[in-house]
């Protein structure tokens, strides 16, 4: 968690007012996200916590611009977000990137790793740089995530382990340097050791480029470990939000208290009868 400074005025990078998403109509209507308000500041690590079906992934898709907002308004850098048309949406996506739960599904299986990283440089506007300089930049990005670029050349992403694939995703973010990173359950499919490494790398990257990181997770323990701000989501609504310390150590909402009580404690005897 970041040490707060009350005198520090940080700008809003993503703000939502009454953001709502409705699927279907009539009797088949489902309100997935129900009039939520939020204000994500530059450089913060924000975690949206909720169980499956709470609406957090639907909200993340609206933040990314993958699906439309039914009601309400999303503001980007202080102004109403305008991503109508391919050109505006492409420009927006230069500044907001995502890491998903399944890294394998994020890659084109026919693209070699060097092509994946080169695409990032081209997207960033480095297409005309000498190849020697591009190689140096890709080497630096891989080094940041403890990978060796020379060992990845001519390999495909599917030849890497799950943890290595997620580290490669972070290398992409290192090259792209977006203003916002949305990480949807980025550590749920990798082992505990790799999970800790990935979280440390994302925190370090936030510190280096002042990137806003939005985590989507069901793991309230993870939220406490890494977050500056936490939003608790239940049935499409935010039932509680604020500083991570306040929300998780001094919860007010019954749902938040239940999420915390469900976290196994190492000193308690676990009930394995239902396993």
Where are these regions (language model features)?
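ABC ATPase NBD coupling module
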Residues: 81-97, 115, 123, 247-251
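Conserved ABC ATPase signature
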Residues: 156-160, 164
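The feature captures the beta-strand-to-loop junction immediately N-terminal to the Walker
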Residues: 49-51
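A short, surface-exposed alpha-helical micro-motif characterized by mixed small hydrophobic
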Residues: 223-225
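Helix-to-loop junction immediately C-terminal to a conserved catalytic motif
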Residues: 64
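Conserved ABC transporter NBD signature motif
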Residues: 72-82
């Amino acid at each position: 968690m970041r040490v707060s400074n009350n005198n520090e005025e940080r700008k809003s990078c993503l703000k939502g007012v009454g953001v709502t998403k409705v699927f279907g109509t009539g009797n088949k209507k489902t309100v997935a996200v129900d009039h939520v308000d939020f204000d994500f500041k530059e450089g913060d690590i924000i975690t949206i916590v909720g169980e499956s079906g709470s609406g957090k992934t639907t909200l993340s898709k609206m933040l990314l611009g993958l699906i439309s907002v039914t009601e309400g308004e999303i503001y980007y850098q202080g102004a109403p977000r305008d991503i109508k048309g391919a050109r505006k949406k492409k420009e927006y996506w230069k500044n907001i990137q995502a890491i998903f739960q399944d890294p394998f599904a994020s890659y084109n299986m026919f693209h070699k790793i060097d092509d994946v990283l080169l695409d990032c440089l081209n997207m960033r506007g480095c297409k005309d740089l000498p190849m020697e300089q591009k190689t140096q930049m890709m080497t630096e990005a891989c080094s940041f995530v403890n990978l060796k670029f020379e060992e990845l050349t001519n390999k495909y992403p599917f030849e890497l382990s799950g943890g290595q694939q997620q580290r490669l995703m972070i290398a992409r973010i290192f090259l792209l340097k977006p203003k916002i990173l949305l990480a949807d359950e980025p550590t749920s499919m990798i082992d505990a050791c790799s999970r800790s490494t990935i979280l440390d790398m994302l925190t370090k990257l936030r510190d280096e480029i002042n990137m806003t990181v939005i985590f989507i997770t069901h793991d309230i323990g993870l939220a406490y470990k890494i977050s500056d701000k936490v939003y608790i989501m239940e049935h499409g609504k935010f039932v509680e939000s604020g500083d991570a310390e306040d929300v998780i150590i001094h919860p007010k909402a019954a749902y938040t208290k239940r999420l915390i009580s469900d976290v196994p404690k190492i000193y308690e005897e676990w009930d394995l009868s239902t396993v």
